UniProtKB/Swiss-Prot annotation:
Main function: Member of a network of 50S ribosomal subunit biogenesis factors which assembles along the 30S-50S interface, preventing incorrect 23S rRNA structures from forming. Promotes peptidyl transferase center (PTC) maturation.
InterPro entries on file: DarP, DarP_sf
Keywords: Cytoplasm, Ribosome biogenesis, RNA-binding, rRNA-binding
Compartments in which it is found: Cytoplasm
Record carries keyword Cytoplasm: yes
Organism: Pasteurella multocida (strain Pm70)
HAMAP family noted in UniProt: DarP (MF_00765)
Entry's family note: Belongs to the DarP family.
Protein name, entry field: Dual-action ribosomal maturation protein DarP
Domain of life: Bacteria
Gene3D superfamilies associated with the record: PSPTO4464-like domains
Length: 180
């Protein structure tokens, strides 16, 4: 047992392993990279529309800063983005990143669906058996309307006319698939 002044320290009873705190060293470069990543997250938030911003869990102060940055230009916008990055450093950004990722993923899913519909439309026009297969898979589809549109699109294609029925098939397929 060691004594020091008025304070008594009992060395035998002290468990050094429990009292040691882990010190995590972070390099200056890593801090800068993290700050830059948060600034880029702030830029993504500033580029969103007001409707999309409402779907993301943001603190009031951060939301006000983002709305202000949307109105600013040039150097003032750059300074405001720095400020948004600073605000993001003080909060947990994981829920914000998750919500932003969901919004971006939803857009990609919509693009993929539209691409599939375009391919289906082309298949329906080029292959007469594809209409029968489509109608077997989707018995709720309007058989007569779809066949008429396909015939009209084939006729337009043969006569080099503007693709009015071609667009109507896409719109019909899009409306039909969204109902399901």
């Amino acid at each position: 047992m060691a004594k020091r002044g008025k304070n008594k320290i009992e060395w035998d009873n002290t468990d050094w392993e429990q009292e040691e705190e882990e010190i995590i060293w972070v390099s200056k470069s890593e801090i800068k990279r993290d700050a830059e990543a948060l600034k880029k997250l702030g830029e993504k938030l500033v580029d969103l529309t007001k409707a999309k911003l409402e779907k993301i869990p943001l603190e009031e102060k951060l939301l006000e800063a983002i709305e202000l940055a949307q109105r600013l230009q040039k150097e003032a916008r750059r300074r405001q983005l720095q400020y948004i990055g600073k605000l993001l450093r003080n909060i947990d950004v994981e829920p914000i990143q998750d919500a932003l990722e969901k919004l971006e993923n939803k857009h990609q899913q919509q693009q993929a669906m539209l691409h599939k519909l375009e391919m289906l439309r082309d298949t329906l026009i080029d292959n007469p058996e594809a209409i029968t297969q489509f109608l077997e898979q989707h018995p709720d589809a309007d058989r007569q309307h779809l066949r008429n549109l396909v015939r009209a699109a084939q006729k337009e294609k043969a006569q080099n006319k503007p693709p009015k029925a071609y667009r109507e098939i896409f719109q019909y397929l899009k409306d039909f698939m969204l109902e399901d």
